[in-house]
């Protein structure tokens, strides 16, 4: 029987091999849709929260607001987002998805889902349930760890 250390090494190597294969496919899929990973992050944030200030997106992305402003320029040129003045402070600009932006976001997700479906088709239904449970647990652990690091001032 393998030791915990050997199992962790096996998992790490398998995940690395999987990500090295999937990542270029995901990037190519986004490129075909005319969206960069950073732009997808903005679209996803707006989809989830409805409307956000440039500063809020910058904080989530850990970049300067000027970087988000440039990205917003490109997304607005493509009619994927709309800018409006904040109702409480007219100096503040809020970003939101347009109908076209919502459609584009769903198209990008569909492309990513198709890639994942190809790989997940090798699993049985039981294995998919296990994989869903394990990855959700790992994602939750990562989020908890990130929040703890931020509280300690390490994030």
Curated annotation (Swiss-Prot):
Entry keyword set: Cytoplasm, DNA-binding, Repressor, Transcription, Transcription regulation
Role noted for this protein: Repressor of the multidrug resistance operon mdtRP. Acts by binding directly to the mdtRP promoter region, leading to the repression of its expression.
Keyword DNA-binding: yes
Origin superkingdom: Bacteria
Gene it is expressed from: mdtR
Compartments (UniProt record): Cytoplasm
Activity regulation note: The binding of MdtR to the mdtRP promoter region is severely inhibited by adding excess concentrations of fusidic acid or novobiocin but not by actinomycin or streptomycin.
Annotated HTH marR-type domain residues: 4-140
Protein name: HTH-type transcriptional repressor MdtR
GO terms for biological process, alphabetical: regulation of DNA-templated transcription; response to stress
Annotated knockout phenotype: The loss of the gene causes increased expression of mdtRP, low levels resistance to fusidic acid, and resistance to novobiocin, streptomycin and actinomycin.
GO CC term, one of those recorded: cytoplasm
Alphabetized GO MF terms: DNA binding; DNA-binding transcription factor activity
Main location: cytoplasm
Outcome following mutation: residue 83 to K: Significantly reduces binding affinity to DNA, resulting in derepression of mdtRP transcription
Keyword match Cytoplasm: yes
Phylogenetic classification of the source organism: Bacteria, Bacillati, Bacillota, Bacilli, Bacillales
DNA-binding region per Swiss-Prot/TrEMBL record: 54-77
Conditions for induction: Part of the mdtRP (yusOP) operon. Negatively autoregulated. Induced by fusidic acid. The mdtRP expression is decreased during stationary phase, even in mdtR mutants.
SUPFAM superfamilies according to UniProt: Winged helix' DNA-binding domain
Quaternary structure, from the entry: Homodimer.
Matches recorded under Gene3D superfamilies: 1.10.287.100, Immunoglobulin FC, subunit C, Winged helix-like DNA-binding domain superfamily/Winged helix DNA-binding domain
């Amino acid at each position: 029987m393998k030791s915990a250390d050997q199992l962790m090494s096996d998992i790490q190597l398998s995940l690395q091999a999987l990500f090295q294969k999937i990542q270029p496919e995901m990037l190519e899929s986004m490129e075909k849709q005319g969206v960069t990973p950073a732009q997808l992050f903005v679209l996803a944030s707006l989809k989830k929260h409805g409307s956000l200030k440039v500063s809020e997106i910058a904080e989530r992305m850990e970049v300067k607001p000027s970087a988000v402003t440039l990205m917003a320029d490109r997304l607005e040129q493509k009619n994927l987002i709309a800018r409006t003045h904040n109702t409480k402070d007219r100096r503040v600009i809020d970003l939101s998805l347009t109908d076209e932006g919502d459609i584009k976001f769903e198209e990008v997700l569909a492309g990513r889902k198709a890639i994942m479906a190809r790989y997940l088709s090798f699993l049985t239904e039981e294995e998919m349930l296990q994989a869903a449970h394990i990855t959700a647990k790992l994602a939750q652990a990562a989020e908890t760890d990130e929040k703890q690091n931020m509280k300690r001032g390490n994030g």
